[in-house]
Amino acid sequence: MTARARAVLLRLILVIGASVGGFILLQEPARWLETHAALGLLQPFAGDRLTAVVGTSIVVVPIHGLPFTVDVTPSCSALASILTLACLATVLPRTTRARRLGALSAAIVTVALGNIVRIAASVGVGLVAGRSSLILFHDWVGSMFSFAYTLGGYVLMLYIVLPKVARNREAEVHAQLA
C-alpha cells in the first residue's frame, strides 16, 4: 500500500469514527436542545397547550382531541445531517482553514435552524389539527423540508468555499454568447 493510499484510508477511518462517536456522544444533548428550542419558538403562540416534560418530549394539548406526547427521536434530530456536513467539509477543495470553518459553520447553522423550524411546524400542526395530522405532516412535509435544508446547507458551504468568478469575466462570457 502506498503512502497516499494509507493517508486516504486513515482519513476515512477517522471521519467514520468521528461520525459514529459524535452521534453516540452528542445525540442526547442535541435532541434536548432542538426540543427546547422548538418549544421556545411555539410557546408564545401556544400558551399552556405545550409543556416540556423529561428530556426530549413535549406534551401537546391540541385544540380538539386528547393530549399526546411528541418525542424527538435520534432520527428526528439534525445531528446526523450536521455530522455528514462536517465529514464532507474534510474533502472540500483546498482553501484557508478560516474559510472552511466559516463555510461549515454557516451550513451547520442552516441545518440546525431548519430542523428546529421543522420540529416546531410539526408540533404546531399537531396542536391545531391533532396527533394524526402531526404524523402526516412530519412524515411527508417534514421529510421534504429536511432534504431541502440539508441540501441548502451543503450548497451554502460550497458557495462559501469555492472560488468566485470575477464579475467582469462573467460579463465577457455573456457578451461572447450574445
Q: Model-found features: residue ranges?
A:
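Hydrophobic N-terminal alpha-helices or hydrophobic patches in metabolic proteins across all domains
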Residues: 1-178
